[in-house]
Amino acid sequence: MKEYDKYLKLLKEKYPTKQSVYRELINLNAIMNLPKGTEHFMSDLHGEYDVFYHIINNCSGVIREKVAMLYGDELTVYEQQELCTLIYYPREKLSILMDENKVNDEWYRNVLNQLIQIAKLLSSKYTRSKVRKAMPVDFAYIIDELIHAQKDEDDNRSVYHRQIMETILSLHNGDEFLVALTDLIKRLAVDHLHILGDINDRGAHADKILDLLMEHHSVDIQWGNHDILWMGAFCGNPVCMALVVRNNIKYKTMSILENGYGISLRFLLQFAVNTYSDKNVDDAVYKAISVILFKLEGQLIKRHPEYRMEGRLLLDKMNLDKGTVRIGDKDYFLNTNEFPTVDMNNPYELTMEEMFLMGRFRADFINSMALERHINFLYDKGSIYKIHNGNLLFHGCVPLDEQGVFDGIVVDCKSYSGREYLDYCESMVRQARTGDSDAVDFMWFLWSNILSPVTGRCIKTFERTFLDKDRNADYKKAIEEDKNPYYVQYENERICKMILREFNLYNENAHIINGHTPVRTKEGQHPVRAGGKLIVIDGGFCEGYHAATGIAGYTLIYNSHGMKIKEHHPFMSINMAINSNRDIESESQVVYVEKQRVFVKDTDNGKQIAEEINDLMNLLKVYNS
């Protein structure tokens, strides 16, 4: 009670009079009765910057819907498309329209008024104060005046607003004002953005995506396995470093390492060419880093018998005379028997050259200022899971056993499973940032283990790299990666409800929102599962998955009316979007409709505001006593 009295005393400093308390209570109660803001969910971006940038700009079709709502009967389809493109890419589209001699004062008047009406529509669910804060500073006063215009008896306001517009045009400031309006529209269209992991992977520009996310007004991230891999590399895990380098070599995205983060591949290239006989330099480099990786993995596995990953120790199972490797109780043909740096008497020991290479990589990773900025952002905005407005968000899984019971690990004689296990994993990720050696090693466990909540499968990198696909009859079975039973059990509504209860979510509209596993739409898979309790939104942004999924990604929109999922078709290019007004074609499917519209008072933010109201009411009692 004494602590609360101290709190009220501090609160009194902020609200020194009864009238100031009344004013804030009126304001907070008004906010509680506004519609909840729109939430936008995206997952598995995989470094695909262009498609991500476009979907961020079009807000998964929200802006196109608002344009159609306002101007469906007034503008042609082409004119609506052009207006949308102008909102998505204002400077680029303006330049093209100017080259086509379409831009004049009359054009500015029409378009600016259209943009003002769109901004007015989108701002209607927010307080005027919040809208004002969202406005570009240079035009905040002017935009505030124009979008809150009200007709008066003598039409004085209309004359006033027309004069504002004419002054903007006479000063040749129309371009900047237009850009400011489009920025506001995009900001108001989505109140909060959720990224369900895997910003990184095979795409070339995860760094540009992170730069864009760092500019976003309201975002959270649920870490994916690829995010954890990069975080582990920056924290000093050599296995994670080798994996990051290997992945970027495999997908030919080395520019993100060298140009994005200043991580040099020059010494690896020299070493590979001098050590391996492959005629193709890329093959030699890939083999060199792969061998280093498996040596480092072996060292880590031996340091941590509690991981129970001895089955991944395969270098010592090779018979180079026969060109085979024993996995389990079977011998498989290797696609090469050239392992000049592997001493079969001590196969997991790095050579001096390999140690030198890893020393260089370590220095580059931990000293990269650009990477540090991005990793700090991932730590600041990220978590293993998030509970938000009655939904449970995570990238991978909540590990289960075959019977659908929560599974996990034992650490220091203590068993962790369910929510407690996910909390433990997050604490280890955060400890890794401090340099704790066990926590740093644990980052690789999270990348590779079937019990990892961000991965949930047994990663078979060695098999996919060194088994001969032509000479091994059961090659496909050998490289098949076992998945955590979660990925079968999550089709069951009872299991999903059990998971939701584990996180204290009992509402009938509570959902698990999940990424990580591409939804194979062309095979009949559906993103909404388990009686509507589970929504999987990894539809494959990455072009490499399009053939398997049949689409180009899913996103999810949750507004005050309910939830709808967006199924996206492949995106051509930003240039085509700008030049030909080609938006991403998307189909919408309603997940559910709220029985009653959701207001701020029904959200997590509403609960916080309710506590503030309660505190202010108690402060009022102090003033009245």
Predicted region positions:
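Feature recognizes metal-dependent phosphohydrolase scaffolds
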Residues: 1-625
